Amino acid sequence: MRSPIGSPLRLVSIAAVCLAAGLLSACAAPERLPDAQYTLSERQSLLLAPEQRLSLTYEGADDTRCPDNARCMAPGRVAYRFTLRIQNVEQAFWLVPGKPGFTSPALRGARVELDRSFDAPARGMIEAGPVSYPVVLNMYGT
């Protein structure tokens, strides 16, 4: 028995094919993205490839480190949230200090990672965490 045209499974399948086509279309781009270092503030975007509407947005940070005036069972960490956009397709990812970077077909073989010399701002007290979490990242062609 065939499923109706508007069935949820069929719509999900069509959406998945469109997503894959959008991300893989970046593979056809002839030029690599340049190696570069960027310093970004929260909610700041970079336009990486205007002809493809490829951008990277630093959304913000999640800080689970122990505040200075608290006792914690585990040390926690800072994780930086990003969104890669190509045309109308979005892909969210996280970068964490000391962990591998991020790659995607949309990045044309490039890798995004936190700069090794970058230190997160101090966590501060419970009531007064850092006002903002700037980030320094590197993009490397592979």
Model feature map: region roles:
Residues 33-55:
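Post-signal peptide N-terminal segment of mature Sec-exported envelope proteins
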Residues 49, 53, 66-75, 123-129:
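Short, solvent-exposed beta-strand/turn "edge" segments of beta-rich domains on protein surfaces
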Residues 56, 60-103:
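Mature extracytoplasmic domains of secretory-pathway proteins
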Residues 95-118:
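Short Fe-S-cluster ligation motifs
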